[in-house]
Amino acid sequence: MNFSAKEKERRHSSFQNILKEYGLEALLLIGETAVGRGLFGDFRYYTNNRTIFYRQVAVVFAESEPVLFAGDAIQTEAAAKMSFIQDCRRISGNLAADVLGLLRERGLSKGRIGVNTEMLPTAWFLYFRKELPEIEWVESHEAIMGLRFDHSPEEMEVYRKGASLGDGGFEAALEMIKPGVSEYEVTAQIEQYARRLGGDEHFTLIASGKFILGNESSLPLVYAPSERIIESGDCVTLEITP
């Protein structure tokens, strides 16, 4: 997303405030391709960078510039162009070792480091604890969520655009839904509409089937689209999240 330099600085300053408030030497932000409340949002919020494969890691320091480990050459080049972080590095093949090397490079062998513990792999934690026994790992996700809920005017415009894309996707679905059309075709129409107008993430769910009021049959529960063909008399339910 194309956020301004002012928005970048606002987020960076907010993260620096967390570092000071909680007495942290650094924040470890882990991004991956999963979907969920805390499962990459902190990372993307700070870096403005999408993870398209495996994981990426950003380390935000209290006393020096942040670093982003972005992946292979393709992902690193993309991060250098699009992320908020200038120092973007390739992953060597062992991301945890890369992070450890960076912490040692910055002279960080003791103190407190914030991390979303739900995102921190057990293997990484055991490795870091062995190599950096004087580091205390501190849960930081809820503090960062507080920042993410405090929306700037620029962010509010993005949310308004997302709402508009959702409305337009619903209208596109109405034009497509009819007997003989598959769930795949309906969701493709929704996502094509949003993608064409700038939607870069899609979480589109659908279900179709018979629903009779008062009958034991329940309203179809939305899930990932399938090849199921919509039939006459079906009810179609949707979740549209561009």
Residue ranges and their predicted role:
Residues M1-G101, V222:
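N-terminal accessory/capping or targeting/presequence segment of soluble
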Residues G36-R50, E131, S140-G146, D150, ...:
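Short catalytic-site patches enriched in acidic/histidine residues
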Residues K6-H12, K20, N94-H202:
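Flexible, acidic/His-enriched mid-domain "rim/lid" segments that flank
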Residues E32-A34, M119, K210:
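Acidic, glycine-rich active-site loops and adjacent beta-strand->loop/helix elements
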Residues M1, M119-L120, T241-P242:
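Short, charged beta-turn/beta-strand-edge "cap" motif at the junction between a beta-strand
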Residues F53-V60, G166-E171, S232-G233:
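Short, basic, helix/turn surface patches
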Residues L27, I113, V236:
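Receiver (REC) domain switch-region micro-motif
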Residues G31, T117, I240:
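Glycine-rich, N-terminal phosphate-binding loop of Rossmann-like dinucleotide-binding domains
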